[in-house]
């Protein structure tokens, strides 16, 4: 068994994963002001279930690999000291998990692309994760898809500013302020600060025209980004996760259509596209899988 941990913006999620990829125990803790303490707390909660584990995989996105390494090197609990550790990006972890026991099980050339809450991507080739020269995964959130200068693009990247939950909400608010009428505005009693991504999706499903338009614009950005990932990697399968899986009824068809417009015909014909199947467990499962890869190589 191996322990996988995902570092989120506001919390830490950990899981014990057996040799078949099954999650046998879970734990979570709030980050607060001390990330190291939060990771340590999650590990302590898993301590009884993780007896016999020898490896710890920690997945973190938006964090420099060296910073993530310093976090795990700072873990002081007796349990964490006994584990061999490895750090991986969340997108790469999700790609590993989906290619192991998820939508791409048995496929040795996979690109994973997901958004929730931020854009992330990972590449598996020959059944192994593809990691950059400096330990980074594809920084898909920074993909430049709009040739304009905007402050939010400089802070979080063009793609992330457009397709992350906050970007989708912001575009709906812009439409409302421009004079378009949406049922979302009624749902929040006119308080635009109360609008959430979930409200936008629910309204789109209820045939709210403005919300449908915002989701279609989102799908266009997602399709362009997915096409660029495929063009660069030429995978056998593209796995779409996060909101592209959970809101697939609104996003999947226009994303596939956009892919068809932007990929060379033979490349599109050879590509298999699937929705991710592992949901929120994908990253912790993949982190555990990555730790197994690293420690097998080092042995």
What are these regions (language model features)?
Residues 10-11, 91-94, 116-120:
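Conserved A3 ("GATE") glycine/threonine-rich loop of ANL adenylate-forming enzymes
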Residues 83-99, 103-105, 111-113:
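ATP-dependent carbohydrate kinase catalytic cores
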């Amino acid at each position: 068994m191996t322990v996988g941990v995902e570092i989120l913006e506001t919390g830490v999620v950990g899981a014990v994963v057996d040799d078949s990829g099954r999650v046998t125990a879970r734990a979570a803790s709030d980050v607060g002001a001390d990330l190291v303490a939060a990771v340590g707390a999650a590990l302590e909660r898993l301590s009884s279930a993780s007896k016999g584990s020898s490896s710890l995989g920690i997945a973190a996105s938006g964090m420099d690999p060296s910073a993530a390494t310093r976090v795990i090197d700072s873990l002081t609990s007796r349990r964490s000291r006994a584990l061999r550790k490895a750090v991986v990006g969340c997108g790469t972890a999700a790609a590993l998990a989906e290619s192991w026991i998820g939508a791409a099980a048995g496929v040795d050339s996979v690109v994973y692309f997901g958004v929730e809450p931020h854009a992330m991507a990972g590449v598996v080739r020959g059944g192994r994760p593809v990691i950059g020269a400096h330990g980074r995964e594809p920084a898909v959130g920074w993909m430049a898809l709009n040739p304009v200068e905007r402050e939010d693009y400089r802070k979080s990247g063009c793609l992330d500013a457009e397709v992350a939950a906050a970007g989708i909400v912001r575009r709906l608010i812009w439409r409302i302020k421009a004079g378009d009428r949406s049922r979302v505005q009624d749902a929040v009693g006119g308080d635009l600060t109360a609008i959430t991504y979930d409200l936008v999706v629910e309204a789109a499903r209820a045939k709210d025209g403005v919300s449908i338009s915002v989701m279609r614009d989102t799908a266009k950005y997602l399709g362009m980004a997915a096409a660029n990932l495929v063009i660069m990697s030429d995978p056998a399968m593209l796995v779409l996760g996060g909101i592209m899986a959970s809101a697939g009824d609104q996003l999947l068809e226009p994303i596939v259509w956009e892919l068809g417009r932007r990929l060379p015909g033979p490349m599109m014909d050879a590509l298999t596209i699937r929705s991710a199947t592992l949901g929120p467990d994908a990253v912790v499962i993949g982190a555990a899988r990555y730790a197994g890869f690293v420690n097998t190589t080092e042995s």
